[in-house]
Amino acid sequence: MKAVLIPGDGIGREIAESVREVSAALNTGIEWQEFAAGAEYAAESGELIAPGTLDAIEACGWALKGPTATPIGKGFRSINVQLRQRFSTYANLRLVHTLPGVPTRFDNVDLVIVRENTEDLYKGIEYMLNDEIANGVKLITRPACEKICRFAFDYARKNGRKKVTAVHKANIMKLTDGLFLSTFREVAAEYPEIAADDCIIDALCMKLVQKPEQFDVLVAPNLYGDIISDLCAGLVGGLGFAPSANIGDSTRIYEAVHGSAPDIAGQDKANPSAILMAFAMMLNDLGETDKAAKLNAAILAQVEEGKVVTADIGGTAGTKEFTQAVIARL
């Protein structure tokens, strides 16, 4: 089968090569179609995404991407947001769990974050009323709320999860977040075997850093989902172990959600774990459950052993050496 591979910026090319090597070692038979995208490509070509990229994703329905840089305060819109809206990948799925061998404050984190991916403030509707007033539109629709809440409960049912918590600020944004919360409660009534509750976003952040094990599945509008995704990654060792899937009706885009790390780009220092774990998510969704399980087990065993690991978790190994160690375990 064919799948699109977008290395992205900074360390992206190095960790994308790790994917190619692991894919070959697992005999997946995937034919990778590689396309450039990101700030570096834009500086060279004047285009954010290489010609043919979107058509290729549309044709095969599967893509895996590395980090792409986005300028702060000005310049082009996030490529991630553009891809999500272009292909209506309405659900962002982030799996967060404690990894043996990675030092953290908690040893029992096991969370799933389901983030609405297409609207909210990320719709990009903002404008200047005059030189001193900027306005942004928080767009929330009932169909999108229902779709993401149903996705969260379906995921919980399929994967043996016991509780789904809605994240909101409906005490202040009574119409927009109020619509999200009321829709969540309507959908929850259809899943009586799954516990359902809700938590205000600021209170949730406090509870996550105090006792994260009290949560199971979190479902949130776009902005809150973005914030708590990184917060939860910090609970288990950082974005170096944060794979993500963007799921639509006909397209799935998997990604490493960490930054492009330009300060170590090209130096063989990057930890490829996140993109390899995202690749494992992709294999699982392709029905290659055994290969996905083997890859995850190899990564976890390598990290737990703690000998041949990258600098971000206390080791001295480079990207290539770590990748080869994982392959040896396969």
Task: Enumerate the predicted regions with their spans.
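Glycine-rich phosphate/nucleotide-binding loop
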Residues: 39-42, 89-91, 207-307
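Glycine-rich phosphate/diphosphate-binding loop of Rossmann-like nucleotide-binding domains
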Residues: 4-25, 130-202, 214
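Short, glycine-/small-residue-rich phosphate/pyrophosphate-handling segment
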Residues: 99-125, 139-144, 259-292
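N-terminal glycine-rich phosphate/adenylate-binding segment common to multiple enzyme folds
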Residues: 43-135, 223
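N-terminal beta-loop-helix "entrance" segment that forms/cooperates
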Residues: 30-52, 208
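Flexible, glycine/charged-enriched surface loops at secondary-structure junctions
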Residues: 31-33, 159-168, 191-199, 288-296, ...
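Short glycine-rich or small-residue beta-strand-to-loop segments that form or flank ligand, phosphate
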Residues: 2-8, 63-67, 164-170, 278-284
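Buried hydrophobic positions in well-ordered alpha/beta secondary-structure cores of metabolic enzymes
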Residues: 9-12, 61, 114, 152, ...
